Structure formats: structure tokens, C-alpha cells
């Protein structure tokens, strides 16, 4: 437990901007404590919840037609692209059957995935389903997964282990390009497992999808609450991926126990405005 003098020492070492950030975290919790007494005792979860869900931290809600256009993909200029095949597998099973069959599976067959399988999974779960007039654009892309304000705060990175015709490495799913953009080359299985203790079974996954939150994409509109919304958005995408993988005959599961800083380093994310939120290893059936 920190002593009072230790806390004061930590605060003294902060810049004025850093001290204001700490104060912003404390104010909502202290107001709740004044109102509710001991029932609002301070703890880490309570501090984060009240700070991030404080209405005062939300930016003024912008009108859909009058706001800036969100950056829908991170810049990866000059990177090589892996185009998707023209013909992709379709989802043909009734939804109720897919819901009944969905399960978290880690027992992958060990054979590689086809590029058409990965392409079909990404496109059916999180591809562009059309366009709409929004954010000063007459053809703003709409995706298959919902998101707060439609700003699409989730980026999907694909760490390729064994996919036919695709070199091992980390890629960004780029629906506008209908393909993958190269981020880093090389076999990254060891790096992923090191960042996710107890997941040696991921070695046999054909690919590992990493869902990352792009906070600035929603922060201009929702303020600090965009951090919470980014988790919701990733959950929507993750569920779509689970259901589409099941329908396509693939095995998939979600992994949330990881070292976020180490994982961000693998993907070249800054770990501040672009943060990893969820891993989803994908593999084939026996």
C-alpha cells in the first residue's frame, strides 16, 4: 500500500499535463464519495469506470452530416498488399444452427488455411456492406459489424502462421483494398505466445486475428468514453467472426489474457491511441 508521502512524491514528479490527467480520473470518484459516503470507496475499477463514463468527458455530440470524417484505417503507406480471391465462400447455414454450433475451439487440425478461407471470414464478418451519406462524405463505408457512431474503431490485424500463398507475418485487413496490407514479415508465433502466457496451442493455428482499438477514431466525438466504446466495438466484431467462422467450418476462439504492451510491439502499434483488445486464433478442423 502506498504511504501518503509516497503518493505526494509520485505526484511531484509529474508534469502539469500529467497531474491534470490524474485529477480528471479522481474528480468523478470524489464527487461520488461526497454524495454516497463509504458506499463509494475508491478502488481501481471504480476510478476507471467513473472517469471514463463521466458525461463531462464526452465531447459535444456531432451531427452525422456535419462532423469530420473519421480515419477508417491506419496509414500503412508503401506496404505490399495481398489481394483476396475473386470467389469467396458464402454463409449458407441457418442462423439458429450456427448459434447452436458455435463453441470456443483450440484443437486445430494443424493444416494450413486457404487464403479464400481467411478472406471469406474477414469479408463476411467485417467487410464493407455498402455506403451511406455520413461525416461529410456521400459514400462513407458501412461495415457488417455495428460500432459506436459508425466510426469503425476496430482494426483487424492478421498474424499469418500457415496460410496458402501468403508469407508468414503480420498484416492489416484493408476492406477498401479487398485484401491485406503488410505490417511486418516473419514467423511471429513465438512472439505471440510470449505475449500470451499459456497459449502454446496457438502454434497450430493457421492465423491469429488481433482486434485493435483505434481510440482517436471515436475520441473526437465521444471524448474519453471512446475507450469504453472501443471495447464494445471489438466485441461486436469478435462475435461476427465467431459466427462466420462456425458457418465456414473453421475453428476459432477468443483470447483476452495477454501483455498489451508486448503485443502492441509485435504489430507496430503505439499502445496508447492504437491498442490491442482481443486475439482470435483461427484454424482448420481435422
Please provide the spans of the model-predicted regions:
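N-terminal accessory segments that position/regulate proteins before the catalytic core
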Residues: 2-211, 215-216, 234, 257-286
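Short acidic/His/Gly/Ser-rich catalytic and metal-binding motifs that mark active-site loops
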Residues: 217-221
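Short pre-catalytic strand/loop immediately N-terminal to key active-site residues, enriched for Gly-Thr
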Residues: 225-233
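Long, well-ordered alpha-helical scaffolding segments within enzyme catalytic domains
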Residues: 234-244
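Glycine-rich phosphate/pyrophosphate-binding loops
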Residues: 242-262
Amino acid at each position: 500500500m502506498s504511504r501518503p508521502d509516497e503518493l505526494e512524491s509520485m505526484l511531484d514528479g509529474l508534469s502539469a499535463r500529467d497531474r491534470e490527467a490524474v485529477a480528471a480520473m479522481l474528480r468523478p470518484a470524489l464527487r461520488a464519495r461526497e454524495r454516497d459516503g463509504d458506499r463509494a470507496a475508491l478502488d481501481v475499477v471504480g476510478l476507471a469506470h467513473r472517469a471514463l463514463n463521466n458525461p463531462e468527458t464526452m465531447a459535444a455530440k456531432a451531427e452525422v452530416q456535419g462532423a469530420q470524417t473519421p480515419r477508417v484505417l491506419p496509414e500503412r503507406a508503401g506496404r505490399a498488399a495481398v489481394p483476396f480471391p475473386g470467389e469467396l465462400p458464402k454463409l449458407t447455414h441457418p442462423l439458429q444452427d450456427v448459434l447452436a454450433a458455435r463453441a470456443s475451439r483450440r484443437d486445430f487440425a494443424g493444416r494450413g488455411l486457404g487464403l479464400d478461407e481467411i478472406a471469406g471470414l474477414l469479408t463476411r464478418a467485417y467487410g464493407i456492406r455498402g455506403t451511406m451519406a455520413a461525416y461529410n462524405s456521400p459514400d462513407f463505408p458501412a461495415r457488417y459489424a455495428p460500432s459506436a457512431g459508425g466510426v469503425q474503431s476496430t482494426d483487424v490485424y492478421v498474424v499469418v502462421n500457415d496460410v496458402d500463398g501468403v508469407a508468414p507475418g503480420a498484416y492489416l485487413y484493408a476492406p477498401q483494398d479487398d485484401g491485406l496490407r503488410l505490417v511486418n514479415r516473419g514467423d511471429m508465433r513465438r512472439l505471440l505466445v510470449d505475449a500470451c502466457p499459456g497459449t502454446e496451442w496457438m502454434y497450430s493455428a493457421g492465423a491469429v486475428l488481433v482486434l485493435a482499438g483505434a481510440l482517436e477514431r471515436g475520441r473526437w466525438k465521444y471524448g474519453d468514453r471512446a475507450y469504453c466504446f472501443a471495447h464494445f466495438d471489438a466485441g461486436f466484431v469478435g462475435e461476427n467472426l465467431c459466427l462466420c467462422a462456425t458457418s465456414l467450418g473453421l475453428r476459432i476462439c477468443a483470447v483476452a489474457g495477454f501483455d498489451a504492451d508486448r503485443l502492441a510491439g509485435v504489430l507496430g502499434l503505439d499502445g496508447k491511441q492504437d491498442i490491442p483488445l482481443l486475439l482470435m486464433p483461427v484454424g482448420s478442423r481435422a
